[in-house]
Amino acid sequence: MSTTTGAFIAGGVAACGAVTVTHSFETVKIRLQLQGELQAKQDAAKKYRGVLHGVKVILQNEGPRGLFRGIGSAYIYQVLLNGCRLGFYEPLRQGLATTIYQDAQVQSLGINVLAGAASGIIGAAAGSPFFLVKTRLQSFSPFLPVGTQHNYKNSFDGLRKIHTSEGVSGLYRGVGAAMVRTGFGSSVQLPTYFFAKRRLMKHLGMEDGPGLHLASSTASGFVVCCVMHPPDTIMSRMYNQTGNLYKGVFDCLFKTIKTEGVLAIYKGYFAHLARILPHTILTLSLAEQTNKIMRRLEDRFLSDSLKENL
């Protein structure tokens, strides 16, 4: 394992590579989640009828630019989120294992889940303003609008306008939902990945390499999507509003279910799956490679004493 700083950089680089491929599905997912917001099912117009239809109508009306709205914010967010999630996971896991078992190498499902959740929550809090702007940019459409519309020129224009109109607290609107959502996802992403990796090596005799990384990250992606989607829907709605629709996470959850039915929290699930599977596969597979590169660079340029402090 590279140093904490090295793992942070490796995780951020890997996530940026992944988000380049999967960002368009994230745009469709957000619009599906906001479609028919707080409207009875029979009254809600279906402007986007699924993943492929969503991609099609956005391309027809807005071009490729429409699918990649908010990509700048997405890069910054991914560096902060996955840098923290992948960079802090192992130090937190080892610290907890040392505290409880007096052995940093002990593998415990409970400790792994807790370390994953904690590292994800740290990343979600750090990157929340950029995810807020990203969500608002992606939901905006001059042709087929859904939810509250925010016409920002770019990510930094969005940050400036939010700060001017809503203050610092506005930049952190929905951060509670983001921490719950990412805590759920992170609590299972890395533990599932490493669990699948160990089992595949032990029972199927797979060797450490791209094939093992692909299989392990696929299993992790499925589990992450199932656990994370309901809080993800709530987070999208909390981020996109300006404080006029929901008082908090539970208010948003109850209003959504009461007005649209319980299945409303699974709106955009298949778009999320289309996004999270390749994103998880690419992030974790690329992270294996970027970590190896960081380790080689650290071994070449850093002394042992300096590595212990990073």
From Swiss-Prot:
Repeat region (Solcar), residues:
2-95, 107-199, 208-293
| Disruption of the gene: reported phenotype | Leads to fluffy and albino colonies, and reduced conidia formation, when all 6 genes ctpA to ctpF are deleted.
Q: InterPro entries attached here?
A: Mito_Carrier_Antiporter, Mitochondrial_sb/sol_carrier, Mt_carrier_dom_sf
**What GO cellular component term, any one, is given?**
mitochondrial inner membrane
Enumerate the transmembrane spans: 8-28, 72-92, 114-133, 178-198, 211-228, 265-286
Q: What is the main EC category here?
A: translocase
A single Pfam family it belongs to is: Mito_carr
What's in the keyword line of the UniProt record? Membrane, Mitochondrion, Mitochondrion inner membrane, Repeat, Translocase, Transmembrane, Transmembrane helix, Transport
List its EC numbers.
7.-.-.-
What membrane topology does the annotation report for this chain? Multi-pass membrane protein
Keyword Protease listed: no
Where it sits in the cell: the answer is: Mitochondrion inner membrane
| Function, in words | Mitochondrial transporter that does not mediate citrate export from mitochondria to cytoplasm. Its exact function has still to be determined.
Family recorded in the similarity comment:
Belongs to the mitochondrial carrier (TC 2.A.29) family.
- Please identify the protein, giving its name as recorded: Mitochondrial citrate transporter E
